[in-house]
Amino acid sequence: MRSSTLQLVERSPVSAAFASVREFGFFAESTYKVSKQSYIKPEFAITNGDGLNVFGKDHGGLKYGGRIDYLPFGLFNNFGQYRQADLERELTPKFVIGANYSYNVGISDRRGSQSGTILYLDNQNNELLPDYLKYGIDFLFKYRGFSLLGEYVNASARVPSGITKYIRDNGSIDTFVL
């Protein structure tokens, strides 16, 4: 769900803390009917991992992500799955539960939204960047104007052991004292 479609004024704290924006890459999604009224919707992406449609120097590696949604009561009307409020006033209960996973190889920003704001170096001044893993689960229920939304996200980083220096925002290099 995009933060611009939230019912409340504030952007989702989860999106603000964990989401990268405007990824550039390959995206694939589909919808499969699995029974009389239930569907699954898988999504997969391989992106640059730095967000914000990076056109300059792209630090780090690729980001691999996937998501799967299960809709046991059928599809939402008029893409209602992607908006927080039940603007369509669903006449029958609608529910979606989804799980997501992403792995960013060599992240150069605290959440992968700008290239090069975090740069670490080894003794030979080669970039050594942490890998970033994120996974979560969420749900959305709507019925006759009522909507209920919940989500859980967990994130972690694997930091390489050879890091000895970092580049500050002003371009100067500092050495770690361990």
Regions inferred by a protein language model and the residue ranges of each:
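Detector for outer-membrane/organellar transmembrane beta-barrel domains
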Residues: 59, 69-72, 76-178
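Surface-exposed coil loops of outer-membrane beta-barrel proteins
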Residues: 1-69, 76-88, 109-122
